[in-house]
Amino acid sequence: MMNFNNVFRWHLPFLFLVLLTFRAAAADTLLILGDSLSAGYRMSASAAWPALLNDKWQSKTSVVNASISGDTSQQGLARLPALLKQHQPRWVLVELGGNDGLRGFQPQQTEQTLRQILQDVKAANAEPLLMQIRLPANYGRRYNEAFSAIYPKLAKEFDVPLLPFFMEEVYLKPQWMQDDGIHPNRDAQPFIADWMAKQLQPLVNHDS
């Protein structure tokens, strides 16, 4: 009869490899670093699109929503190191800058902050995903153009995916908007979750 200890020693490297593979698969986390558009403004976090996306993906990828209503890019940057350490994400979706624009920050300032965010994400061996942000038309053409240009510039500079702004789809349905004309309401969240799943699917290697 084969000695049990010998069998265990023979299988130990294989078991160790299986364990590492399982842990790697279980560790795939998408961290969403955003503002009120992703935080679920005036609704419970469980009703917001990141939670619905997490439900949709089930165990394929864990979606951690670290979005806070009102956050500027600078505030997001300040929170990022602790989030990276705590969650050790594989991907970080950066949905920030809207509050910078609404407060009239200089586009160069927002650009530099977002650049630092992308640098920090890459330094943590995570993959940044950048979302295009656009401002209401009443902020003026010159400011809007300078602000909107930040995102493709940084996406090219860091060679990272640039996701379309999901609000451009939501704006087409007035019944999906809150009274402030800025934030999507609860009825819009399932659509956003499905739309984001389609955008993210080729980036995280999902079938749905």
From Swiss-Prot:
pH dependence (record): Optimum pH is 7.5-8.4. Stable between pH 6.1 and 12, however, below pH 6.0, thioesterase rapidly loses activity.
Gene Ontology molecular functions: arylesterase activity; fatty acyl-[ACP] hydrolase activity; identical protein binding; long-chain fatty acyl-CoA hydrolase activity; lysophospholipase activity; peptidase activity
Signal peptide: 1-26
Keywords noted in UniProt: Hydrolase, Lipid metabolism, Periplasm, Protease, Signal
Result of knocking out the encoding gene: Cells lacking this gene do not show thioesterase activity and have a little protease activity against Cbz-Phe-ONap. No effect on the cell growth and fatty acid composition.
Highest taxon in the source lineage: Bacteria
Binding site for substrate: G70, N99
Class of the enzyme per the UniProt entry, highest EC level: hydrolase
Residues at the catalytic site: S36, D180, H183
Temperature-dependence annotation: Protease is stable up to 50 degrees Celsius.
Record's subunit section: Monomer or homotetramer.
Family per record: Belongs to the 'GDSL' lipolytic enzyme family.
Function: TesA is a multifunctional esterase that can act as a thioesterase, lysophospholipase and protease. TesA functions as a thioesterase specific for fatty acyl thioesters of greater than ten carbons, with highest activity on palmitoyl-CoA, cis-vaccenoyl-CoA and palmitoleoyl-CoA. TesA also possesses an arylesterase activity towards short acyl-chain aromatic esters such as alpha-naphthyl acetate, alpha-naphthyl butyrate, benzyl acetate and phenyl acetate.
Protein name: Thioesterase 1/protease 1/lysophospholipase L1
Record gene name: tesA
